[in-house]
Amino acid sequence: MGIRRYKPTTPGRRGSSVADFVEITRDHPEKSLVRPLHSKGGRNVHGRITTRHQGGGHKRAYRIIDFRRDKDGVPAKVAHIEYDPNRTARIALLHYVDGEKRYILAPVKLHQGDMVSSGVGADIKPGNALPLRNIPTGTVVHAIELRPGGGAKIARSAGASVQLVAKDGPYAQLRMPSGEIRNVDVRCRATVGEVGNAEQSNINWGKAGRMRWKGRRPTVRGVAMNPVDHPHGGGEGKTSGGRHPVNPKGRPEGRTRRTKKSSDALIVRRRKQNRRR
């Protein structure tokens, strides 16, 4: 993937950039692997906003991605590399020798015409999926399961990768992009390689309208609102809010205050955090 930068012909074009899409080989999805996707606009079943800053955007169709990679021993050919509006990564359409078609995340160095497979006997090359116990230490992987057979949960976005650093009994130790080292069951599957489209993070969107096309609405500061709309609202002239930062419902904002998760017991080393002085 490369990035094409625009000349400053308009204020919105100044500094903006776009992906060149040179790796894309087809401009329409496989019909049998597409489902309708209904926009919720951040509302729940009662019509109330539960997630702010969502709504609008271009209509999308959902591409069904194979995150389980459970078709063992059946080789597949990469028929196309396609664009997916629902994620930052590109997707690869696989044609299995038995006639089935599936989508997977397209890793780096996977091209149209390549062969991929999954299972214990698969080779260690980009796009192949194996249990962690069958992957050599030091290998870079993505699309990793947290529970055997549960489907990939870790390292699925563009440019994401995790390194297998050690194996100890029933667990494999993975180094996350954040620096965290976590134990994962060796029976869990992972795909060899790094997710493609790594330059995605370098795109300059240029104007608010491109964010609206993606379904992202503006984020308004609470101190710019009225008291009826936000706890920080109101006051004469410009104010600082007069209290510690809170969300519109009055709950503390900023640092997360999540309860302990059961999977935290599998963390070997925490990620490095910027500590306040």
Curated annotation (Swiss-Prot):
Q: Which GO terms describe its molecular function?
A: rRNA binding; structural constituent of ribosome; transferase activity
Q: Does the keyword Ribonucleoprotein apply?
A: yes
Instruction: Reply yes or no: does the keyword Ribosomal protein apply.
Output: yes
A GO CC annotation recorded here is: large ribosomal subunit
Q: Which GO terms describe its biological process?
A: cytoplasmic translation
- Matches recorded under PROSITE patterns: RIBOSOMAL_L2
Q: Which Pfam families match?
A: Ribosomal_L2, Ribosomal_L2_C
Q: Which SUPFAM superfamilies match?
A: Nucleic acid-binding proteins, Translation proteins SH3-like domain
Q: Which NCBIfam families match?
A: rplB_bact
Q: Which family does it belong to?
A: Belongs to the universal ribosomal protein uL2 family.
The protein here is known as: Large ribosomal subunit protein uL2
